Amino acid sequence: TVKGDVHDIGKNIVGIVLQCNNYEVIDLGVMVPAAKIIETARVEKADIVGLSGLITPSLDEMGYFAAELERQGLKLPLLIGGATTSRVHTAVKIDPNYQSGPVVHVNDASRAVGVVASLMSAERREAYASEVRAEYAKISAAHFRAQQDKKRLTLAAARANAVPIDWSTYRPATPTFLGTKVFSDYPLEELVEVIDWTPFFQVWELTGRFPAILDDKVVGETARSLYDDARKMLEKIVKEKWFKASGVIGFWPANSVGDDVVVYSDESRTTPIATYHTLRQQLEKREGRRNAALSDFIAPKDTGIADYIGGFAVTAGLGEDEIAMRFKNANDDYSSILVKALADRLAEAFAERMHQRVRKEFWGYAPDETLNNEQLIKEEYKGIRPAPGYPAQPDHTEKATLFKLLDATRAIGVELTESFAMWPGSSVSGLYYSHPESYYFGVGKIERDQVEDYAARKGRPLQEMERWLAPILNYIPSREAPVSSISSGDAPAPANDAVDADMSSHPPGCGCAFHLRYRNRKAGANG
C-alpha cells in the first residue's frame, strides 16, 4: 500500500490468491514510500510490482511512483489496484508516466492471476503489454471526447444557482451540549445490531445485497459460508473484547459566510475558532437543479439565525492489527483478513449508531425517529453526515480542522497520516448537518476559478491545493500564471472522468497524445 495510505484488505486478498497459484509475494505492508518499494524490487529481483490504495491522494502517489520507475530506468510491469483506482485513471494518469514497462489496472483479485501469468510469459508478455497500451490509448481518447460535451459554469454563476433555502421560517434545534463528548470502550454488542453487511461481501468480491446474496444462485453457497464464519468470529470479538471501540462527537455554534462555514467558540458568536471550507458543484445543471455546496445547509451569518454544526470521529480498530497479525503469524491469512473486514464493519456501524443518537438524543432534532436498520442503510433519516475526502467535500485536508476541533488523537487515539488517511484504518470521521433539506451530493469536476478562490480562502498556495484536489480538477495544472476566471463560452479543458470521481489530472508538461491533442486544439490546429 502506497505512502500515506493504511488500507490493505484488498491487497492482502490479492496476495493470497497469487500465493495459492504458486507465485512468491513480498508484502511490504502499508504506508510504504516509493523509494522503499523500488529498492526492495531491485534487491529481491522482483518480476512485477503491485501498488494499492484506498484514499484519493494515493492516486497521485501512484503516478509519482510510475514516474520514478521511468526515471530510474526500471522496466518492471506495474499493477495498479484499490478502491480509488480505475482503468481511466491508469490510462490517463499513470501509463503516460511509465513508458519503459507495461502498466495494468487490476480491478479484482480473481483477475490478478491471469494478468500476472500473461506478464510472466516470455511468449505472451510483449503482445499482452501492447494490447493493454493500445486499449488505454483508446480509453484516453474516449475520455477526451466525452469532456468536450460537458459544460461547466463559472464559480460566480454556480454560486448564483446555490440551493435555495427559506431561512425566514427555520429555527435550528440547539444541541444538548457544546464542545466535545468522548465515548471510551463503547459496547460492541450495540454496534452489531446496525452492521451493514453488503459492503462486507463486496470486500470478498461477492456481488449482491444482503440478505438476498445468501440465496443467490451463483454465489449464495459461498456467501452463506462466509457469513457463518463472520458471525462466529464476531461473537468472539464481542465476548472476548478482541479490540475496543472509542469515539468523540462535538457540536459548535456555526454560520455560513459564502462557501465557508465559520465555527464559533460560544453562543456569543464573536470569536471564530475554525472555518470549514466547502466546494461547489460547477457542472451546468438542467432547469431546476442546483449547484450545491455544503455551506448551503448552514444558516448564513447575515440572517442572524443561531445555527450549529457537529463533528465526529470513531474507531473500532484499537487492537485490530495485533489480532490480525496473530492470525497471520499462525499462517491463517483467511482469519487475518476476516477480522480486519469485521473491524471495518464495526467502525461503520459505530458511525451509524452515533449519528442515530445525535439525531434523537445529543442534538435532538429528530427525537421521535423510529427507523429500522434497513432504513438507516438507505439514509432515510433527517440531516446528513458528510466526510472530508468524499464526494460532497473531496478535500481530505479538511480533516485537519475536524480533528483539531475534536482533539481526536488525544481523545480516542486516531491519527491522520501525511495523506490524511486515518490510523487505525477501521476509523470513520465526518460532520453533522441537521437541516431537513440537506442532502448528499457529489461536487464533481471543478474549474480553475474555484480552485484559485478555494486556495485563497484556505490561505494555501494554489499549486498545493491543486495537488490535493487533483482527482476533481477539470483542467490541467500548469506552471503558467493562473487565470482569474473562465467564460461560459470556453471549451472545457481535457479533464478527469466526470463519471469516475477518482480520476487525477495529468502532471505538468505531460507529453502524451491526450495532451498534444488538447494543446493543438487550443492553438487552433486541426485534429
Where are the regions a protein language model picked out?
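Amphipathic alpha-helical packing elements
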Residues: 69-91, 177-213, 446, 451, ...
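ATP-dependent carboxylate/acyl-activation modules
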Residues: 1-51, 260, 283-291, 298-370, ...
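Acidic, low-complexity intrinsically disordered tails
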Residues: 151-161, 166, 461-462, 466, ...
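Cofactor-cradling patches in redox/metallo enzymes
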Residues: 11-21, 27-97
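Active-site proximal loops enriched in glycine and acidic residues that flank catalytic Cys/His/Asp
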Residues: 1-3, 13, 29-32, 50-58, ...
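Conserved phosphate-handling catalytic cores of large alpha/beta enzymes
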Residues: 65, 69-77, 82-145
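Active-site loops and adjacent core secondary-structure elements that bind or stabilize anionic groups
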Residues: 108-336, 341, 360-362
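Compositionally biased, low-complexity/repeat regions
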Residues: 247-258, 356-456, 462-463, 467-470
